[in-house]
Amino acid sequence: MPDSRAAPQESLLDASLGTTQENVGTSSLTDGQTLSKEPLSHALKLSTPEKVKDAQLNPPEEALWTTRADGRVRLRIDPICSQTPRTVHQMFSTTLDKYGDLSAMGFKRQGTWEHISYTQYYLLARKAAKGFLKLGLERAHSVAILAFNSPEWFFSAVGAVFGGGIITGIYTTSSPEACQYIAYDCRANIIVVDTQKQLEKILKIWKHLPHLKAVVIYREAPPMRMPSVYTMEELMELGNEVPEEALDVIINAQKPNQCCALVYTSGTTGNPKGVMLSQDNITWTARYGSQAGDIQPAEIQQEVVVSYLPLSHIAAQIYDLWTGIQWGAQVCFAEPDALKGSLVNTLREVEPTSHMGVPRVWEKIMEQIQEVAAQSGFIWRKMLLWAMSVTLEQNLTCPSSDLKPFTTRLADYLVLAKVRQALGFAKCQKNFYGAAPMTAETQHFFLGLNIRLYAGYGLSETSGPHFMSSPYNYRLYSSGKVVPGCQVKLVNEDAEGIGEICLWGRTIFMGYLNMEDKTCEAIDAEGWLHTGDTGRLDADGFLYITGRLKELIITAGGENVPPVPIEEAVKTELPIIRNAMLIGDQRKFLSMLLTLKCTLDPDTFEPTDNLTEQAVEFCQRVGSKATTVSEVVGKKDEAVYQAIEEGIQRVNMNAAARPYHIQKWAILEKDFSISGGELGPTMKLKRLAVLEKYKDVIDSFYQEQKSKQGSSLPGFSLRWQTGASS
């Protein structure tokens, strides 16, 4: 190792550790493919029944929550959820026994797909764990990962847990300041990065991170030799210096009710909160939450999954990483530019059996299909519209019927099967979405392609899914049924049966790291998690989300107005609208901010000025020649504004009462985005940020207008221009 580096610190290891020699390749992944199986047979001793019994619950006096990284909690074992708790290592050991020779991960190297088996995956995780220990990983401290999805992300995460640490993901889009907050809060001993860009962020803030001992970089080489900065290959070499027995001692001491993962919320209302997840949270949810979604074990059918959503978010982490281990799935990694356009190429090559996307991803796929259709020949376009029309009608009228009419089967054979194949969904049996609401328009579009989108509902605080839809539990617009073994209750229900959703079960998190007040707000005295979301349950137990308590608008007149149903109604009525945000808290009436559907820059994923094909078609239907946002907004296109006003009036006509009417609105010059601050990492609307950013526009809605002069479009009551009431 370079002499300029500080010597790695040892913490959980005895200072007199010996060394063992193993085969060392030229890269961390090649290394995993050539490792001897001798350490594996040694490690498997830990998965015997005697070791499983060792992982027992702690005494019953332990509380249901803690805010300490080294704390333990009482597991929520009861008659309906009595499964034996397991650690992550025990889960992986069972997988090795069943699926050791199966492909665990697929990744592209120089244009060619390569694979890592579960045996190789396990050995890589052990070597990473020993490397982390050699670098000074302390118990209940973190290994933070600031990188795009990759095999290194996976075996570093598992290795961190094996080594007694806590895995903490950081969004790759995070600023240095955001990285500093998380790395400091989680007491990161080691940070793993994939590029020089991410390394530079850490170098800027290192002096503010007293617990940080080393950085590991793997996709790109560091620009120069630097103290305490290692490549992944060097980390693995350091792991050779730690005996297998030393790692076994650490693994064997782990308990299911200890923290092994931290998931940081997006911080829409302040600093991000570190959601502490126990080993039992992870292993129970990976098994039973995925079963509720009909994920299959590899002995029945090996699931194939494309990993591309941020692993720092609980949805991707539980679905890609932990569920993959539980059932022996093959996880194939997309390119880092997946969300900039390459995802479909990966889907075509991999042909996944199940797939998950946030609503914006599904919307982007929908827009791409619409653009291709608009540029296709007349006959093909008409055939596609016919096929989607008859298929949508069938799926809406007989959603559970396996007996399809001849016309529906013909439409699928002639048209829709080809579309699904072009998307990479020829073999995909389960398509999931979560993390944000999905419009009825998007759901109908994919039903027209004979693609059901199965919703799940959960939070970081529920380790991911607490409700799941599946081919056997599906109802349009619902979030599915509660995962067997979990519980739900609605509190403070109104006359329509809508109340706050409260949850209980093995999915419920340990607590917020270092935030006792926030933890007590979330978990009541009886141990129920108060989600802050509102919803209703139908007679069959399907959950329908109606909004959030914190988002509930209380007008100056005392009317309680949930914004989401009104926003969704506007987007359904006006297909040119991408984002709609209702305003009116403590105001005399409701108003709304709108953005138009525009294309995204393929390199930056930023909104452009160009309208999508669907938006252009809308303009043409209403008599406008506009093709850009600036033509509509900058020139106040009369035809488009009139059409939007009429659409909003139609929404108002269907409102329950006049206080629910949208009285004023404005179209913003640019669509919402992550970089603009209006959207979170999963494209969820950050309402407080929008209120602050567009404060002047909003205030203009409620200023008393002294004169109506200056209106270029009489008859609009200046609703959309200056905020004057009609």
From Swiss-Prot:
Modification type Phosphoserine: residues: 36
Catalytic class of the enzyme: ligase
Chain residue ranges for the region called Disordered: 1-39, 707-726
Xref: InterPro entries: AMP-binding_CS, AMP-dep_synth/lig_dom, ANL_N_sf
Modified residues (Phosphotyrosine): 641
Pfam families: AMP-binding, AMP-binding_C_3
Molecular function terms, GO-annotated: ATP binding; long-chain fatty acid-CoA ligase activity
Composition bias type Polar residues, residue spans: 17-36
UniProt EC number: 6.2.1.3
GO terms for biological process, alphabetical: long-chain fatty acid biosynthetic process
Gene3D superfamilies: N-terminal domain of ligase-like
Keywords tagged on the record: ATP-binding, Cell membrane, Cytoplasm, Cytoplasmic vesicle, Endoplasmic reticulum, Fatty acid metabolism, Ligase, Lipid metabolism, Membrane, Microsome, Nucleotide-binding, Phosphoprotein
CC annotations in GO: cytoplasm; cytoplasmic vesicle; endoplasmic reticulum; plasma membrane
Domain of life per record: Eukaryota
Main location: cytoplasm
PANTHER family: ACYL-COA SYNTHETASE BUBBLEGUM FAMILY MEMBER 1 (PTHR43272:SF93), LONG-CHAIN-FATTY-ACID--COA LIGASE (PTHR43272)
Family: Belongs to the ATP-dependent AMP-binding enzyme family. Bubblegum subfamily.
Physiological role: Catalyzes the conversion of fatty acids such as long-chain and very long-chain fatty acids to their active form acyl-CoAs for both synthesis of cellular lipids, and degradation via beta-oxidation. Can activate diverse saturated, monosaturated and polyunsaturated fatty acids.
Protein name listed in UniProt: Long-chain-fatty-acid--CoA ligase ACSBG1
Organism: Bos taurus
Chain's gene name: ACSBG1
